[in-house]
Each structure stands twice: as C-alpha cells, then as structure tokens.
Design a protein with these regions (language model features):
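Canonical positions in the second alpha-helix
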Residues: 5, 46, 50, 83-84, ...
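Register position in tetratricopeptide repeats
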Residues: 21, 25, 32, 70, ...
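Alpha-solenoid helical repeat scaffolds
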Residues: 14-18, 24-25, 57-63, 93-97, ...
C-alpha cells in the first residue's frame, strides 16, 4: 500500500506527493462533515512536507486556515494567513480573512483600520468589495458602541462609514441618532437631508425631518 511505501521511502518525492493527495482527500471529506479538528492533522501533514508544488501547498494552507477559523483558534489562523501571504503575495482574500479573524478576536477597530488602508490602496473594483466588507463589520460595532453608551464613538464610526458609502442606510440612521444624542444639530440636519435624498419614502427619515422642521420653527 501507499502508506507502507511511504514508510519505506519517506523522501521519495512522487510517493510523498501521492500521500499528500490522499491526505487532502481525507481532509476535504472531514471538512464537509464539519469535523475540522479531525481534518487538521491531514492538512498539516501536507503543509509540513513542504512539497515543492505551490498549488498543493497553497491548498493545504488554505484548508488549515479554514480549520483554525472554524475551531476558533484565531492566533494560529493569523499565523497561517501570514504564511499564505508570504508565499502568495497576490493572495486576494488576505485582507478579508484577516479582518474577519481580528473581528472575531474582539479587535474590530484593528480590522476596520485594515479595511481603510486596503480601500486607500485599491482600484475601483476592489474598493467596492472592501467597502462592503468594512460596512459588514462597522454596523454591528456601531450598534455595540450605542448599546454601551459610547455615543461619541458610535457617531465617529458612523460618520466614517458614511464617508465610504454615502447611501448606507444603517450608517445614516446611526449618524442621525448619535448626533441627536450628542446635541450636534447641524450634523443631525445634514444626515437627515442625506437620508431623505437616498430614501425619500422611508418613515424614519421623514420623522427625523419633521423634528428638524419643528426645531427650525422655534
């Protein structure tokens, strides 16, 4: 069998490659079943063999990353991601994956910062991609700030979000609510007008506009 041959000739390249393929197949099956802890040793066998084949290595590291994330072993996930980006500088998912992991580690501000620098350096196509990613993390973070009574922080973060995506419905709502609580009436008015502009039929913005008009009468 292949296993016996591998035990006899552990340095034979073709046998190692065949063994690696077998381990990858096993890992795939286990991962499909959600058995990430069981899949991990199979994946690590491949990545630790340093097979002189970038495709094989890349696939093994990708799977290891997925296992670590699903097992909530985030430090190891970050280390694996570092390995991937070192060997594959053009790895496109790097920013998204890193931001996702940082957010899971309660380092959301760091994750948002990562997106901001990616947005600054990206072309138009990738920019949209990163802005969507940014918004996905920013909205729950702003909500968390609001609930914790960190209104100023919530306001700052929602303004950042709107500057990236001016039509962000939730971004605008949080900016309006937080500016109102902070007594920033000019901003309250500005973001209400922006909301009405994008969502003229939306009752939330109409109600806020009524508040603005009421205040102007006084």
């Amino acid at each position: 069998t292949l296993k016996k041959m591998y035990e006899m000739y552990p340095d034979d390249y073709d046998i190692t490659l065949a063994m690696s393929a077998q381990h990858m197949k096993k890992a795939e099956k286990l991962m499909e079943l959600g058995l990430y802890a069981e899949a991990l040793p199979h994946v690590l066998f491949v990545s630790q063999k340093h097979v002189d084949d970038n495709e094989v290595n890349g696939a093994a590291w990708e799977k290891a990353l997925s296992c670590y994330i699903n097992m909530k072993r985030y430090n190891e996930a970050l280390a694996t991601l570092d390995t991937i980006t070192l060997h594959f500088p053009d790895y496109e998912n790097g920013t998204l994956k890193r931001a996702f992991i940082l957010d899971k580690m309660d380092k959301t501000e760091e994750a948002l910062q990562l997106y901001l620098s990616a947005i600054e350096q990206s072309d138009e196509d990738m920019r949209i991609f990163y802005v969507i990613g940014y918004e996905e993390l920013a909205v729950p973070y702003i909500k968390k700030c609001m609930e914790a009574g960190a209104t100023k922080k919530a306001y700052e973060e929602s303004v950042k979000l709107i500057s990236l995506n001016p039509s962000s419905d939730l971004g605008l709502r949080y900016a309006i609510n937080s500016s109102g609580l902070l007594g920033k009436y000019d901003e309250f008015e500005k973001y209400t007008a922006q909301g009405i502009n994008y969502y003229p039929e939306e009752p939330f913005y109409q109600a806020k506009r009524a508040t603005v008009l009421e205040r102007d009468k006084r």
